[in-house]
Every structure is written in C-alpha cells, then in structure tokens.
Amino acid sequence: IKNTLKNIEISQLKTDLIDSKKEDFQIIGKSSQMQKIFKDIGKISTNDHTVLIRGESGTGKELIAKAIHLNSSNSNGNYVQVNITAIPSELLESELFGYEKGAFTGAEKRKIGRFEEANNGTILLDEIGDMSLDLQSKLLRVLEEKKFYRLGSQKPTSFNSRIIASTNKSLELLVKKNEFRDDLFFRLNTLTVDLPALKDRKSDLPLLLNFFNEKYVGLNGQIKSFDEDVLNIFAKYDWPGNVRE
C-alpha cells in the first residue's frame, strides 16, 4: 500500500497539478455545437457553482474543465485533475482527502489530499460515474458542508474550491440502477456542458486536421496541406475515439 500510494502521488503530481497560466491548449471548432460550448463556458465562468461535463471519451472534457477554470475568478488558484478510474478504489479516499501520520499502516507522515491541493482553485473529478457509493456520500458531505476530514483526523479542513465533475456515462441511468446517489447527482447537475461526438460536428474536421498537422508535423514541412480525397475519407469516418483519436 505504501509503495502504491507513493507511485500515485508522484505520477499524479507530475501530470495533474497544473499551473494554469503556463498550460498550452486550444479548443478547436467553429461548428454551431462548439459555438454553444464556448457560450456555455463564458456563462459558467462567471460563478463558482458545481459543473457537470458530459461526453464520450475523447471529446475534450478535460480541456473544457481547464477553460472554465482559466476564465473564472479562481483562475489564480491550483487546477487539480483526478482520474477516478486510474486510482484503486481502496486508495481513492486517502488520495482525495489526505491522511494524518499513523492513520493506517504505511502512513509515516501527513499527506495533503487532492481537495486540499486545489485550495482556492478548481478540482476536476474525471469519470465521476465510477466513484463508489461510499465515497459518493463523503463527496456529497463536502459539497454540503464545505469541509472535509483527513483520514485519522478529528479536525475539519475547510474546502473553498470549485468542483467540476465529468463523465462518459449516463448518471441518470446509474441513479435508476441505484449505482449513483440521486442527491449527489442533483448537486452536481447544477450547471452542465454536453460535448458532442466528433461524428456530429464533422464540419470542424478541416480545422482539427490543420491544427494537429501544424502541431506535430507541420514544423518539419512534411505535410503542407490535405488533398480533397483525404478530407473526404476522413469525413466518411465516424471517429469512435473522437478528437483524441
């Protein structure tokens, strides 16, 4: 457990705790679907309510979460991303809330959790639909009371960051199957962003192709442009992996 915790701590701190001002990313699209997304980001960024981002894998949920953070009043705070599916369920609670020295075997010193790292910033809970029911109840308590407890501590820690949750599943269906708490769903469902699949906004394909071409191979002069035949082939493809593919 000790080694697993250490590996998770090192890898996630390297990849997930982001200095937003230095983050280099772009959201590409001029389609009507993406124009609506941009408007949604603008409206959502004016407040600090909880946000739920829904969309298939590869549609850019993480980018949207970062954009909301960057345009919000807490943009100077940390942006922390937690992939629920990447952390073993038995370790997720200590990863989110942190723990005190001696809280369990292997806890040799206090560890700050992900909620605490996001102080005055934003935390993205990626793939919230995979969170256990037990942990869902504790997340609900954080949303209601604006505080949490490190494992092994009786002293509450204040929570003053924005929570953004993302999912590629239907939380409504999970609620009906008693696999997701309805009260937590209502808390998360305050503001929503629904991302379209790439097959539903193929008019953005030329923009995306040019963007990735310039980013990855254009600097070497390997590809100047795409032939019409190539564009037609891409347009006929349904891109099941979406923009990530």
Task: Annotate each language-model stretch with its function.
Residues L13, I37, T59, V82, ...:
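Conserved RecA-like P-loop NTPase ATPase core
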